């Protein structure tokens, strides 16, 4: 086994604006992380991945040197996320769902990029939905990065039940997993970006004082009222009602914090509608929902999903593990990869 001659591996994750490199022992001990404020947005803006390459190179060098190591001791770098896209380091085609951890390991794309580092980089493919002949494009979706997060989460949940992992962010992801723990597809929304734009660049910016809900200001009642308003009145009308409440209500309901929570509920209704009308999982009532992410989406999505009653159960995920989910999932695939080469 190649890894047996080395003592460490690195997992590398690049997103829109940031890159993270994590150091691990071959046995799975997490040793630390280095970050770089560079991502695929830089490539999109520059028309070249030169800046991204430089940032990744510096990040990897710092990680290795700060640990008192050399690249000769690194068995490989396992890269996931948008780094495998056309605005990353190297574009690698998606896997087609369904896909298990072993499938990702078997389909790893190895590459030598000496202008980035002297160690082979093993690119972990993203996933695209399977599209049956004659099916509409509305059933197609893609992800790069959330698949490794999902594989990490699956280590903490038993096989034998179907899951949907809800991973909020700028782009919200619903990742569907069958009872054999294979990823069967995903569903993407723009909820995070919508919330940011409405909060800062619409007439409602005044009502919410251009502020987002935090874990300290979260109000379940206001979120659910906004959620139900969007269900009953439609998205646009529910949004404008925030301004009406601000102008004509008194007390708590006239506060910017109430308005921000109400707005969160209105926007999250889009996610629930998308889930309800999805074509990947027809038996939502038997599916376990796991919400993993940061506040206020963690509480907001848990509450509106529970209120909607679409899923068998809805659970919040929390962990004290110091490594990010993406790194833990990439390490799992690395382990499968090395074991498959024995």
Label the model's feature ranges.
Residues 9-13, 74-78, 163-167, 289:
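Short glycine-aspartate micro-motif
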